[in-house]
């Protein structure tokens, strides 16, 4: 017994890994190990011999199992120590920077133009995106036969048979907010109405949903000269140029009379737009003097008050200023695109600190 004990305890002590230790266990206390074979020989012994050999073999087996367990624990601790040394992590190193969100270019452009018009005394007003066709069309002097009222251009809300409520549409412009503001605030009035609008169109420069800002100024003795000054100041501030030349072209809009589309002098240098210089012209907005019928629809006397209005595509402004080639990219939720074109949430646009940085 002493020889077996010395033999296997020595082998256990010399085992360098769990595979070697398992081999010792099988040779010593496995089903075919030496201790197991000795146990089988107990049947051949006399009762007196079994009384001496049995307890001694059990004690040897227990001692070997205890040594195996202790050695296995020691090998496990050693392996863990080695793993910790090889996979050491310096907790004093700075962590990977956490990504911050960024401001979408449309939101940035909206904030910038709101700041510009606020300096000129315009307040921002909002209205429902689902509105009646009266606010969206009739109140704006858009007759029933006008092409804009066709279902191919306008999203109409579904009505069940027998539903006699007035037709509702997804607003095709933010002009309904002008009517609601006239009803609510009266005159004199200076407002802008930024927000999302909807039209049934989709290509590189059109999407079913886009953003507009429309402006309205009502007062006594307002003229096209006031409109021209406001638009010039806006364009200079938004594109951050000292001088700008605008060209007013006669046009037709049902809600203004006279009406004008406004172009801006510009040039293209290797695909880069330069505002205020060059021989090219770029259309940027529509405008005009508010039609008397529209003023009357807002509950204001058109004999006493006149006004001007303008409409600008915010998405188009953002494309021109930030060099974005495809309008559809605004709505594709591509984080890589947003990280490239997005703005810091801490850069609040002001005319004093600079609009976009």
UniProtKB/Swiss-Prot annotation:
Signal peptide: none annotated. Disulfide bonds: none annotated. Keywords: Aminoacyl-tRNA synthetase, ATP-binding, Cytoplasm, Ligase, Magnesium, Metal-binding, Nucleotide-binding, Protein biosynthesis. Pfam families: Phe_tRNA-synt_N, tRNA-synt_2d. One of its GO terms (biological process) is phenylalanyl-tRNA aminoacylation. GO terms for cellular component: cytoplasm. It comes from the Bacteria. It is found in: Cytoplasm. It is an enzyme of class 6 (ligase). The keyword Transit peptide does not apply. Binds 2 magnesium ions per tetramer. Its EC number is 6.1.1.20. Its cofactor is Mg(2+). Tetramer of two alpha and two beta subunits. NCBIfam families: pheS. This is Phenylalanine--tRNA ligase alpha subunit. It comes from Ruegeria sp. (strain TM1040) (Silicibacter sp.).
């Amino acid at each position: 017994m002493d020889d077996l004990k010395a033999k296997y305890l020595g082998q256990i002590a010399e085992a360098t890994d769990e595979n070697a230790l398992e081999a010792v266990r099988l040779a010593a206390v496995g089903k075919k190990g030496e201790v197991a074979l000795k146990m089988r020989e107990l049947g051949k012994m006399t009762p007196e011999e079994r009384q001496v050999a049995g307890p001694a073999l059990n004690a040897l087996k227990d001692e070997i199992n205890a040594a195996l367990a202790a050695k296995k624990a020691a090998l496990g601790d050693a392996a863990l120590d080695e793993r910790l040394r090889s996979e050491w992590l310096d907790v004093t190193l700075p962590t990977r920077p956490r990504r911050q969100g960024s401001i979408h270019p449309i939101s940035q452009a909206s904030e910038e133009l709101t700041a510009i018009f606020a300096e000129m005394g315009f307040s921002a007003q909002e209205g429902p995106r689902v509105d009646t066709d009266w606010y969206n069309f009739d109140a704006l002097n858009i007759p029933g036969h006008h092409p804009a009222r066709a279902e191919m251009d306008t999203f109409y809300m579904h009505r069940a048979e027998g539903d006699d409520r007035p037709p509702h549409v997804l607003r095709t412009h933010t002009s309904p907010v002008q009517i609601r503001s006239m009803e609510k605030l009266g005159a004199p009035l200076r407002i802008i109405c930024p927000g999302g609008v909807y039209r049934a169109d989709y290509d590189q420069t059109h999407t079913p949903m886009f953003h507009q800002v429309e402006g309205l100024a009502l007062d006594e003795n307002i003229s096209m000269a006031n409109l021209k000054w406001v638009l010039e100041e806006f364009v200079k501030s938004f594109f951050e140029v000292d001088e700008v030349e605008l060209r007013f072209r006669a046009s037709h809009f049902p809600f203004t009379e006279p009406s004008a589309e406004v172009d801006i002098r510009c040039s293209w240098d290797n695909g880069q737009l330069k505002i205020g210089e060059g021989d090219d012209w770029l259309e940027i907005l529509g405008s005009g003097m508010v039609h008397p019928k529209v003023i009357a629809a807002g509950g204001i006397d058109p004999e006493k008050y006149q006004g001007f209005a303008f409409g600008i595509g915010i998405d188009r402004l953002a494309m021109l200023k930030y060099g974005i080639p495809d309008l559809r990219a605004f709505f594709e939720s591509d984080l890589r695109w947003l990280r490239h074109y997005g703005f810091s949430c801490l850069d609040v646009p002001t005319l004093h600190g600079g609009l976009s940085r």
